[in-house]
Amino acid sequence: MERTLTILKPDCVRKQLIGAVIDKIERAGFRVVAMKKTRLTQETAGEFYAVHRERPFYGELVEFMSSGPCVPMILEKENAVADFRTLIGATDPAQADEGTVRKLYADSKGENIVHGSDSAENAAVEAGFFFSAEEVVRVD
């Protein structure tokens, strides 16, 4: 079983779409093995997105991700990383396929409802950023 990390971003929480997005995730065959609601500080958001520090959108991303509560989750499924990225769609909702999370719910490239890990290796690192081993519940 592969795992991936997702974050339901502040726009998702603000628009009261947590349940709708989790429903799509579970209907797609993913199991939620860890989940919490938290609020990132600018410092914490900056650490999480440090890989983008030199990108022009970094400051806006950090500001947005610290603007309200978010819901990080670890999801489990065969081929979890690729399947989840397919489920959520392109970063820009205008480019996302019909029926994807971002096409359905996102307003813009910057406020696009959800983060999804881009590799199994990054998923493991990102999951460790939010969750201790004790917080991950094995689903059999």
Swiss-Prot record:
SMART domains: NDK. It is an enzyme of class 2 (transferase). It is found in: Cytoplasm. It catalyses: a 2'-deoxyribonucleoside 5'-diphosphate + ATP = a 2'-deoxyribonucleoside 5'-triphosphate + ADP; a ribonucleoside 5'-diphosphate + ATP = a ribonucleoside 5'-triphosphate + ADP. Keywords: ATP-binding, Cytoplasm, Kinase, Magnesium, Metal-binding, Nucleotide metabolism, Nucleotide-binding, Phosphoprotein, Transferase. ATP binds at K9, F57, R85, T91, R102, N112. One of its GO terms (molecular function) is nucleoside diphosphate kinase activity. It comes from the Bacteria. The active site is at H115. One of its GO terms (biological process) is CTP biosynthetic process. Pfam families: NDK. Its EC number is 2.7.4.6. GO terms for cellular component: cytoplasm. SUPFAM superfamilies: Nucleoside diphosphate kinase, NDK (SSF54919). Its cofactor is Mg(2+). HAMAP family: NDP_kinase (MF_00451). Belongs to the NDK family. Homotetramer. Major role in the synthesis of nucleoside triphosphates other than ATP. The ATP gamma phosphate is transferred to the NDP beta phosphate via a ping-pong mechanism, using a phosphorylated active-site intermediate. PANTHER family: NUCLEOSIDE DIPHOSPHATE KINASE (PTHR46161), NUCLEOSIDE DIPHOSPHATE KINASE DDB_G0292928-RELATED (PTHR46161:SF3). This is Nucleoside diphosphate kinase.
